[in-house]
Swiss-Prot record:
This is Heme A synthase-mitochondrial ferredoxin fusion protein. It is an enzyme of class 1 (oxidoreductase). The gene is etp1. It comes from Schizosaccharomyces pombe (strain 972 / ATCC 24843). GO terms for biological process: [2Fe-2S] cluster assembly; heme A biosynthetic process; P450-containing electron transport chain. The keyword Transmembrane applies.
Amino acid sequence: MNISRSSGLMRQFLLQPLRKGCDISCLGRSSWRMSRSFSGSSVLNEINLSRTKNLFLNDCKFNKNSFEKFFARRLSNSVAPTPGGILQETEKIPSKKVAFWLLGSSALVLAIVVVGGITRLTESGLSITEWKPITGVIPPLTDEQWNQEFELYKKSPEFEKLNSHMTVDEFKNIFFWEWFHRVLGRGIGLTILLPSIYMIVTKRASPWLSKRLIGLTGLVGLQGVIGWWMVKSGLSEELFSDGSHPRVSHYRLATHLAAAVALYIGLVWTGHGILQRHAFLKSMKSGSTSQLTSMVSSVQKMKGFRTSVNSFVGLVLITLLSGAFVAGLDAGMIYCTFPEMGEGRLAPSKSELFDQRFCRKDDKSDLIWRNMIDNPSLVQLEHRILAITTFVAACGLFIFSRAKRNILPKKIKTSINVVTGVVTAQATLGIMTLIYVVPVPLAALHQAGSLVTLTAALSLAQRLHPEYALKNIRSWTKLISSPPKSSISSSILTQQRQFHTFRPSFHSEIKKPLPGTGIKVFFVTPEGREIMIEGNEEGACEGSVACSTCHVIVDPEHYELLDPPEEDEEDMLDLAFGLEETSRLGCQVLLRKDLDGIRVRIPAQTRNIRLERPKA
């Protein structure tokens, strides 16, 4: 419920400890609430209830003999393997080794993209005129084999139009880069294909991971087909005609790069996602689930920021792919100055940017879009605009993170810092590559930087969508029920997580209900034990880390008397386990006269139901 519905006094004693960073375990008379249960948390049979004049509680010492007016409780937000509950997989959780394999494969994809860029820069891509998936792995080893390969190259349009002066030794240099590119591609295919087949056939991969692996192996095969389709465009008979310039189609080059980027994204996203899920699982086992769910909830509320980051990832992708058009058209070889394109001009003339010579229709209706993808001058200008926009957007994210540094999780702030640094370095590399007229080392670094930038953006985006990882962890695991009571010994008390609360000194005006004026609330424990408390008819809490992860199951008779849940409450309930049709957040229920005698069941997974007299 909103603060506006709470009394001023309630706001005072609740929000003050929140500002001081305390963990508010419960609120006694003014409202009731129950922390969210995680499937499999153990249920302790010991219940500690004792008299208190204070609404804020300290550590519990189990005492079954004392309870009176006020009831407090705290779910264990940990799914740690304790004697009372053991985490068990219901679906095979991908191991970290799988994540490292996928990320290692993505590094190989990055390497082949760089090698492909060098192949394009050295004009080596058409040096091998045949497609031999098996025998092509072995390069020519003797002079006779080299001469045979060179004779095949002599029949290509590129040799006849551009390299008729080339010798066998010069041919060996360009042959190496194309051969290395193809062999590396085959190696990547085997690196992804063989482990994928093994894991799927032996059922070592979960259904979720199996689908990903099938998609990734399909992309590998598709990439090989696209690569040869691209090379064939540079061997076309039409390129023998006068005025032609033998080179691969820049459309197919962009498609080839796009397929590689899609494979790279799939590998990085899946590998990083597995590591993220393991990090969440570790948090749940260590008892930090409340912090984890609080983080997920707070991140989900940053809808505008998440949309901005998603748009930023799209912008990085478009900028990257526009670079393929720049490379395919050799557009980086013109206007090698920055920021000007020509003397004293930020852009060439309109007639140059929209040249009618690039039109293919008689009525010139394709003037604009044809120039956008075929005109080197306009293509370079587009890449500049996209790159500058990406840089400005990254700076905007950085400024936002500084302004919101108190509410953004640390890892997200770190990711934004990395994105800003990488984008700045990439922009600098791009300008240097242009000014120095596309030297191969700088251009290769610039191409590698594009994928590094994409990686940083993807990592940030994935951190801003943690709900998917958390949902998977919950669906993949369950908690074994509590062991027999005999197994609960004194040792369990030392293993239970202790919960601390802050005891403010300014709530003394809040008094116990006068006889006959209190509103009775009956809590039914998982063991069927009924506990009655009385509370005043006054405001409930605004909410905290504790109450944002809680729910109880209201008796149907009284459920109809409650106000309908608001959107925020429904969002929180979506994160909880063990929900039933009448589940509600306790912190959102105001005690009223018509609710006198209300009965609520505590979720079966609850443990550590306790109340402790505060220390003086």
